[in-house]
Amino acid sequence: MSKVLIIGCGGVASVAIHKCCQVPEVFTEICIASRTKAKCDKLAAELAPKTTTKITTAQVDADKTEEVIALIKAYQPDLVMNIALPYQDLTIMDACLACGVNYMDTANYEPENTDDPEWRAVYEKRCKEAGFSAYFDYSWQWAYSKKFEEAGLTALLGSGFDPGVTQAYCAYAKKHEFDTIDTIDILDCNGGDHGYAFATNFNPEINLREVSAPGSYWENGHWVEIPAMSIKREYTFDQVGQKDMYLLHHEEIESLAKNIPEAKRIRFFMTFGQSYLDHMRCLEDVGMLSTTPVNFNGQEIVPIQFLKALLPDPASLGPRTKGKTNIGCIFTGKKDGKEKTYYIYNVCDHQECYQEVGSQAISYTTGVPAMCGALMLLTGKWTTKGVHTVEEFDPDPYLEALDQYGLPRSESHNPALVD
């Protein structure tokens, strides 16, 4: 029996909230909080007849730590689920520390304003020292580890699919399939079609910043950075077919390099259609992906935020998206002295997700793991204090929960490898 404060009411949060309400014996009470309370009220009214979970709602500006603290003190939750924006990770972590409450999120911190001088100085130092230039990294949140540990609290970082489930797949492979892991390739394939010439399947601002950044991968103990979208491979995905995929920088590479240090190479690939790439490159060329404010008719606007307002809301894509996703990890390594390969992945159907929770599969594959991560903390399956990523915990109960609540795994012991 637990009380959970869920901050966020977008596409991913909606899925996570639906799934929490399917486990009322654990999620006894939830409070849905967002900047726009009307969205929370609408979702609560939709779910109330379908669950015995007690649902309340609240308004909060998660950019303001004092507002989050006031809400936590008023609601007294056992856990805060941050399913808002990664810009707000640190303010919510500060509030959890101030109130003595466990924390979890689905994506690591990145700043909204990448021109902020204080942040920029730290960022440029990290670029030189670490060797990759993506705006997002774990260092800001890892810096909280001692504070959470001393407070007797747990902060679970990145319990989505990638990051999240992909790291659990790595922990599972290390625990059950390999003595040593040599290489990890994380493959994220979306074979869905929403019918638009251009749209993003999750927050456009976050998505386009991620995809337009230089790619990077971990090899032989250091980062290798490449121009954005410059490494392309083809792969045939189960139940989807052959797709073009591109090497990206992705946050779980950073934590996996730390926690599976014997891995000689770790890469992340994501599929994209040609229409998406053509539109993205055009928008980048004309400055629409910029985070630097510009003056327009006497008013400052951020180009990428203006673009977000013009694009379809990812939460609206559910009814029109058809096809499947396939996300997983391919490993090479050794077991009992012998070379071995292994592939563990999930296939998810967009229309089945929509029929269950009114969402497309991209939000579903992030929202379900968010609920399952919360489940691990609330039921005492994961109890390590401090700030931790998913692969640092026992993967077995987490993957069993994913199997049960909508994201079952598949395996291959003879997969095609990525060159």
Where are the language model's segments positioned?
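N-terminal Rossmann-like NAD(P) cofactor-binding module of classical short-chain dehydrogenase/reductase
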Residues: 72, 78-81, 103-105
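N-terminal Rossmann-fold NAD(P) dinucleotide-binding loop
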Residues: 13-14
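Helix N-cap at the beta1-alpha1 junction of Rossmann-like dinucleotide-binding domains, i.e.
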Residues: 35-39
